């Protein structure tokens, strides 16, 4: 159960950075403030394969902030696997690889809503305070592939923090088209709690 909205960005618009400011005055446990649910431009792969897709048509990844059931507050960034089919019908699966942080105890592959990789990092975001999430694409110095970094800026302290970064396994990738954001309750026992989010 969640409430969602879309940033109306034309489908052919490509961009390398994505910034959202948000505040959650009420964020009980079981709250997910998803600030980006986006599509990546994989035209580099589309020139090499007959078919390129992710588990959900038009959605490549998502990121935001959660308040877990035990009260722990975290950031999350996820990328779905990319399935590339060649002319012979052979399928190559490309999974993003985390390059920062070097290790966390909550970094893992995911399944259930498709398959892919996500990084969950402790970040003590507080109710009633403004934050900015900043996603940006760059180029890996070691692989030449596109890197996507997730940053957070705390307006109260003036501090910017790099939360995580992924090597997408493919060069020349950027964001494309509209992006969704949503406020979700992901724990049924807490579904009656009031939650808010402004973006």
Residue ranges: model-predicted function:
Residues 95, 156, 161-169:
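N-terminal secretory-pathway/extracellular module detecting exported/lumenal segments
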Residues 13-17, 118, 126-128, 143:
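Short, surface-exposed loop/turn motifs at beta-strand boundaries within globular domains
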Residues 163, 167-193:
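Flexible glycan-contacting loops in extracellular carbohydrate-active proteins
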Residues 109-120:
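Short acidic (Asp/Glu) patches
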Residues 1-105, 120:
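Secretory/extracellular carbohydrate-interaction modules
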Residues 26, 81-85, 139, 156, ...:
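Short loop/turn segments at secondary-structure transitions that flank enzyme active sites
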